[in-house]
């Protein structure tokens, strides 16, 4: 399953970019990152067999194990692409939220989009390592 990060804003070079690169290098699943301008630009069209997750402070809070189980179930169910969308400062429109398969949050706090991207990269590494049985995540699997 392709893990596709679609993010508003350019990450450039900096500590957040280094974290994203470090964690995404560890992920063995197919992956893609699409950067869009802060305003305008078109989100790439979703292909058949894809799922879209929006990262939003008002979304569902999932544990790392729940996130891993979601990805594993989608992969095993034939989902070809999981799209993770990180919005700009104003978040997502009601239509975008309505069209998403899932809206999740990394806690109740508001995070800058560059930090959210780094946190997503770490959670993708953690989830795929849990699925692979790698000892990175110390909590037992459900």
UniProtKB/Swiss-Prot annotation:
Its EC number is 2.1.1.177. It holds the Pfam family SPOUT_MTase. GO terms for molecular function: rRNA (pseudouridine-N3-)-methyltransferase activity. It catalyses: pseudouridine(1915) in 23S rRNA + S-adenosyl-L-methionine = N(3)-methylpseudouridine(1915) in 23S rRNA + S-adenosyl-L-homocysteine + H(+). Keywords: Cytoplasm, Methyltransferase, rRNA processing, S-adenosyl-L-methionine, Transferase. Gene3D superfamilies: 3.40.1280.10. Its main location: cytoplasm. One of its GO terms (cellular component) is cytoplasm. CDD domains: RlmH-like. S-adenosyl-L-methionine binds at residues 55, 87. It is found in: Cytoplasm. Belongs to the RNA methyltransferase RlmH family. Homodimer. Specifically methylates the pseudouridine at position 1915 (m3Psi1915) in 23S rRNA. This is Ribosomal RNA large subunit methyltransferase H. It comes from Sphingopyxis alaskensis (strain DSM 13593 / LMG 18877 / RB2256).
């Amino acid at each position: 399953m392709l893990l596709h990060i679609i993010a508003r804003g350019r990450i450039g070079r900096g500590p957040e970019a280094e974290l994203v690169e470090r964690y995404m290098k560890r992920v063995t699943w197919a992956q893609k990152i699409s950067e869009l301008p802060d305003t305008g630009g078109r989100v790439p069209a979703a292909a058949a067999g894809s799922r879209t997750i929006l990262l939003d402070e008002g979304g569902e809070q999932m544990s790392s194990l729940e996130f891993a189980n979601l990805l594993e179930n989608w992969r095993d169910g034939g989902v070809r692409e999981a799209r993770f969308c990180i919005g700009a400062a104003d978040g997502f429109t009601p239509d975008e939220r309505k069209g998403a398969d899932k809206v999740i949050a990394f806690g109740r706090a508001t995070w800058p989009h560059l930090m959210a991207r780094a946190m997503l990269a770490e959670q993708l590494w953690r989830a795929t390592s849990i699925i692979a049985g790698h000892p990175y995540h110390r909590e037992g699997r459900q």
